[in-house]
């Protein structure tokens, strides 16, 4: 199985010849995972993905396999709520209330989109001047500097693909890391100091 450990953002992929490149259709949850096994569209095989953690793939991004093969990412249609408002102020107010609930939010000039949630729809109905419509659409929220949402610990990407993820991870991490020990053993590692007992170190995730 080929492994893709990097990708090209859609804005930089304009000069690539993708006429024969296979595609892979992914939901937002899948596009946020860094390590997984992918089934290519139209039965064109499988691809292992092991990109840098914290990345979110977008529609039109291009995965690059180790042998140089390109695979075009396509965003799947998802169950979303599209919010419109009578005035820009009312739309901004809706965005404020959704943001307070840590909702992954796609912000467009004339509307907002979020993963459909009936409770949030009821909340918006109480604001006045706001309309929420349920539909199937591509969902590409602005994850911003925070990475988006409440994702803690490892990506939810291992499961049945644990063996692939481990192999891909070790291949990705094979390059040496600079780690200076100049000045003796006085360096400090994040998450623990050397003044305590070594048996009490927290396991790094």
Curated annotation (Swiss-Prot):
Q: What is the annotated role of this protein in its UniProt record?
A: Involved in urease metallocenter assembly. Binds nickel. Probably functions as a nickel donor during metallocenter assembly.
Q: Where in the cell is it found?
A: Cytoplasm
Q: Keywords on this record?
A: Chaperone, Cytoplasm, Nickel, Nickel insertion
Name its species.
Bordetella parapertussis (strain 12822 / ATCC BAA-587 / NCTC 13253)
Region (Disordered) residue spans: 171-205
Designated name of the protein: Urease accessory protein UreE
Biased composition (Basic residues) is annotated at 177-196
Could you tell me the Gene Ontology terms of the biological process aspect for this record? protein folding; protein-containing complex assembly; urea metabolic process
Task: Kindly give the NCBIfam families that the UniProt entry links to this protein.
Answer: PRK13263.1
Q: Which GO terms describe its molecular function?
A: nickel cation binding; unfolded protein binding
Taxonomy, top ranks, is: Bacteria, Pseudomonadati, Pseudomonadota, Betaproteobacteria, Burkholderiales
Q: Name one GO cellular component term.
A: cytoplasm
- Provide the family line: Belongs to the UreE family.
């Amino acid at each position: 199985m080929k492994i893709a450990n990097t990708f090209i953002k859609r804005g930089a992929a304009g000069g690539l010849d993708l006429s024969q490149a296979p595609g892979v259709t992914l939901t937002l949850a899948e596009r946020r995972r860094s390590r997984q096994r992918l089934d290519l569209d139209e039965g064109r095989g499988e691809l292992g993905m092991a990109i840098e953690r914290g990345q979110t793939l977008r529609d039109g991004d291009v995965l690059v396999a180790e042998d140089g093969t390109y695979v075009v990412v396509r965003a799947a249609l998802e169950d979303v709520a599209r919010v419109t408002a009578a005035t820009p102020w009312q739309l901004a107010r809706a965005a404020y209330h959704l943001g307070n609930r840590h909702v992954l939010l796609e912000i467009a000039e004339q509307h907002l989109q979020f993963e459909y949630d009936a409770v949030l729809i009821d909340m918006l109905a109480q604001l006045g001047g706001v309309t929420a419509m349920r539909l199937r659409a591509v969902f590409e929220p602005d994850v911003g500097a925070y990475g988006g949402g409440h994702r803690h610990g490892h990506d939810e990407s291992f499961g049945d693909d644990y063996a692939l993820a481990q192999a891909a991870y070790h291949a990705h991490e094979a390059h040496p890391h600079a780690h200076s020990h100049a000045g003796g053993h006085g360096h400090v590692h994040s998450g623990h100091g050397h003044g305590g007992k070594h048996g009490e170190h927290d396991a790094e995730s």
